[in-house]
């Protein structure tokens, strides 16, 4: 397998940004994947935030994502946005620290109760979710954007969820002579990057493809955007629109030791943090234009960097797969697993790496490691000479070069974005939640601006986010609607996550049904249909 890492977005500038007098539209060309790793040194890394730290609950919510196919390993960051199942179930432990499901023999794990399913929904960027190409995905995501089967080399072979934490795993003998077992034993007592392979491949719950009913044509002289649904087969020079936001569905079979560990040690704390932060009604900000400018911005994610910390991989070995049980009843509507609905992952034996020379995902916060200063603000005219960036908010509808290929089809970015001062997280951090001083998520991080006037493609210290919920106080000068809501929907948004939540009766939908907030409850009485599946 050729290991080419696609680890995030870099947005390249053909002229020096800080001293440019041209417009933002003029010097933003097509975003492209970065294939290097970040070397920034000013951020706090590999430090689990304390319980009273503003970053603490977002640490609980956040994970590193690893998609592997025959061509590449792709890393991104994701965070819990929703779930389905009993988040209060405590998987009991015996004195050896194993979950009850781990201590049963495989022959005992055949009942529907043992095969029950907890489903985590992880938000990330659309360009990160492009790494998921699963033949058993929901339609239309089970084929490429042209309706064709994925080429074999593009198909996702395995998926792992990662976190910087105490590994809490037993020593596994490997085929490596070094590091010695004693060294590994010591490393297992320290905070490390732990990747766990889930028992099955994820699916796509939501992709922000054509969230609004407009198409984009760069050759039109009287306006680039045209009202009406875009058709990939007869679009001519037109292309559809996208926002850099997606949600993947991660099934956890609680009779599988790896899945049980993810649920018990990572997902349950994430659901508790989610509720602490305000649950569905309080977690997702929707503010007016001026409020975004006045906010302070915090970011926690997993950019790929060089560091000396250990990485451990807990794979689906034959022993763990034996703990899975499936129902053959494809009409089964209970919370059990069917063979037809999930793709079992191939075995990946457990292994340990003390140092990976090419870098590994690194827990990083936008906290200055020298001064301790936390967070940042949007870029302003005192820090940059380009007046079109003066308020730190941008309208992607007018930036012709923001084009993304998702599942082999090109789309044009729309919506609004935040430009973060001195928060240039590198590849692998794409998909991180950007949250404000009130601990509300207001946008999702998708890349850093890069200056290509030098041979080194230097990062200029500015990060980019996609705003998830834009109210009517945003006044676009372009044809696309100036309000949208990628999570709960609004009058302009025809494809949004709450449609999936309703169809699958998730935690978010249960809260939407009972809310008195008209904006969050928009879809309760909406006749807007699900656009993608």
Swiss-Prot record:
InterPro entries in the record: Mycoplasma_peptidase_DUF31 (IPR022382), Peptidase_S1_PA (IPR009003), Uncharacterised_MG067 (IPR022381)
Alphabetical list of PROSITE patterns matching this protein: PROKAR_LIPOPROTEIN
Keywords per UniProt: Cell membrane, Lipoprotein, Membrane, Palmitate, Signal
Coiled coil ranges: none
Superkingdom classification of source: Bacteria
Membrane topology recorded in Swiss-Prot or TrEMBL: Lipid-anchor
SUPFAM superfamilies: Trypsin-like serine proteases
Lipidation (N-palmitoyl cysteine): 22
Signal peptide location: 1-21
Subcellular location: Cell membrane
Keyword Cell membrane included in the entry's annotation: yes
Family from the record: Belongs to the MG067/MG068/MG395 family.
Protein name: Uncharacterized lipoprotein MPN_083
Organism (species): Mycoplasma pneumoniae (strain ATCC 29342 / M129 / Subtype 1) (Mycoplasmoides pneumoniae)
């Amino acid at each position: 397998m050729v290991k080419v890492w696609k680890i995030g977005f870099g947005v390249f500038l053909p002229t020096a940004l800080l001293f440019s007098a041209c417009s933002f539209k003029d010097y933003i060309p097509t975003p492209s994947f970065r294939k290097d790793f970040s070397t920034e040194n000013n951020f706090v890394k590999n430090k689990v935030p304390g319980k009273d730290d503003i970053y603490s609950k977002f640490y609980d919510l956040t994970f590193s994502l690893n998609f592997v196919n025959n061509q590449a390993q792709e890393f991104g960051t994701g965070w819990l946005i929703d779930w389905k199942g009993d988040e209060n179930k405590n998987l009991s432990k015996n004195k050896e620290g194993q979950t009850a499901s781990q201590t049963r023999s495989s022959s005992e794990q055949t009942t529907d109760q043992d095969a029950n399913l907890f489903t985590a929904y992880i938000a990330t960027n659309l360009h990160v979710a492009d790494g998921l190409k699963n033949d058993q995905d929901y339609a239309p995501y089970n084929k490429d954007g042209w309706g064709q089967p994925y080429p074999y080399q593009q198909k996702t072979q395995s998926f792992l969820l990662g976190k910087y934490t105490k590994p809490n795993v037993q020593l596994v003998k490997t085929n490596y002579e070094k590091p010695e077992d004693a060294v590994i034993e010591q490393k297992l007592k320290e905070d490390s990057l732990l990747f766990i392979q889930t028992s099955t491949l994820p699916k796509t719950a939501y992709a922000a493809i054509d969230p609004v009913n407009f198409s984009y044509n760069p050759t039109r002289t009287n306006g680039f955007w045209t009202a009406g649904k875009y058709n990939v087969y007869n679009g001519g020079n037109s292309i559809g629109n996208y926002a850099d936001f997606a949600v993947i569905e991660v099934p956890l079979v609680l009779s599988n030791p790896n899945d049980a560990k993810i649920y018990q040690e990572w997902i349950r704390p994430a659901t508790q943090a989610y509720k602490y932060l305000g649950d569905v009604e309080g977690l997702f900000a929707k503010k007016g234009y001026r409020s975004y400018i006045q906010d302070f911005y915090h970011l926690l994610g997993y950019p790929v960097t060089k560091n000396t910390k250990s990485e451990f991989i807990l794979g689906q070995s034959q022993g763990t797969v034996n703990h899975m049980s499936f129902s053959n009843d494809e009409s089964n509507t209970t919370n059990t697993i069917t063979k037809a609905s999930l793709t079992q992952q191939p075995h990946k034996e457990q292994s340990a790496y003390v140092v990976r020379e090419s870098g590994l995902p690194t827990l990083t916060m936008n906290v200055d490691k020298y001064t301790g200063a936390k967070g940042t603000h949007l870029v302003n005219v005192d820090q940059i000479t380009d007046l079109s960036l003066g308020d730190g908010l941008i309208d992607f509808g007018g930036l012709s070069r923001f084009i993304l290929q998702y599942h082999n089809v090109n789309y044009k970015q729309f919506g609004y974005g935040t430009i973060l001062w001195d928060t240039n997280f590198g590849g692998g951090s794409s998909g991180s939640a950007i949250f404000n001083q009130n601990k509300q998520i207001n946008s999702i991080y998708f890349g850093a601006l890069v200056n290509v006037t030098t041979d080194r493609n230097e990062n200029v210290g500015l990060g980019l986010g996609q705003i998830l919920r834009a109210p009517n106080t945003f006044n676009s000068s372009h044809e696309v609607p100036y309000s949208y809501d990628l999570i709960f929907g609004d009058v302009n948004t025809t494809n949004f996550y709450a449609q999936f939540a309703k169809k699958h009766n998730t935690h978010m939908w249960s809260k939407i049904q009972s809310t008195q907030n008209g904006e969050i409850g928009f879809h309760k009485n909406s006749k807007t249909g699900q656009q993608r599946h």
